[in-house]
Amino acid sequence: MTEQRHNHIPQEAFDWYDEYAHGLMDRRTFLKKLGGLVALGYSMAMLSSALLPNYALAEQVSFNDPDIKASYKTFDSFKGHGEGKGYLVEPANLTGKHPIVLVIHENRGLNPYIKDVARRLAKAGFIAFAPDALHPLGGYPGNDDEGRAMQRSMDKQKIQQDFIAAAEYIKRHPNSNGKLGAVGFCFGGYMVNYLAAVDNKLINAGVPYYGTPAVKELRQNIKAPLLVHLAEFDKRVNATWPEYESDLKAHQVPYTMHMYEQANHGFHNDSTSRYDEKQAELSWQRTLAFFNEQLI
């Protein structure tokens, strides 16, 4: 996998994209700001290439890899949207008991990058299940802007209940060893923190990548060990860390936090120029080691 960072793009452009992608800046303002860079000599084509995802770059494990098998499963979500759907990836020729990892997408639905993350976990010997929050609206639409708009239009409380239902569903997998981990990115990082806090028996280990914490009143419930990945340039999420860390310490939650130098929010996502190959691979090796330690 070739590193996708565009070091010649001003950091401000990545910051603006982060605000736009998380609903803190409207599209008109975002494009106007990019237009200011065009006036300085940057081409809009180059900026678009640098900021928008190219999912052809994100496939590290093919869907037809002989070491895995993938399928889609639906599950009941009575407190959520009624029914959920997820991408289940298992090691091929599955026998015996295996740990399970819930894989939680960003704020735009189950895109190809997150599906590939699930395949990477199965390739490493885990059973992986990646639900799609957009299933009630027909599923991930094929592009991130529309996916973000769809997810933003949905009831957040019901989405949270759908992920609780997904965790409860996949824990009943016949080949489960009884341990469930969760890894999530951006919104998914928040969901990992939320699942750890809303029911301290739901997950056994959590890995939030650049995710905000659960609301303060729930944090006292957290028991699962956490491996927290943060990016140096992610001012929005990093601003929430000092208080969250203080609460984790106060409630004696076992945790480790890694701050990845010169990395942006989304540095693990190899479909965008925010991808940092070195930091992404380091964080992933730490993630696999953590799950092997906590779930096996």
Locate predicted features.
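Alpha/beta-hydrolase active-site loop
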Residues: 149-172
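Cap/lid segment of the alpha/beta-hydrolase catalytic domain
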Residues: 134-157, 266-271
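N-terminal secretory signal peptides
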Residues: 1-29
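N-terminal export signals
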Residues: 18, 29-53
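N-terminal cap/lid segment of alpha/beta-hydrolase-fold proteins
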Residues: 57-94
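Primarily recognizes the serine-hydrolase "nucleophile elbow" in alpha/beta-hydrolase
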Residues: 165-223
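Short beta-strand element of the alpha/beta-hydrolase
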Residues: 97-106
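Short beta-strand/loop motif that positions the catalytic acidic residue
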Residues: 228-230
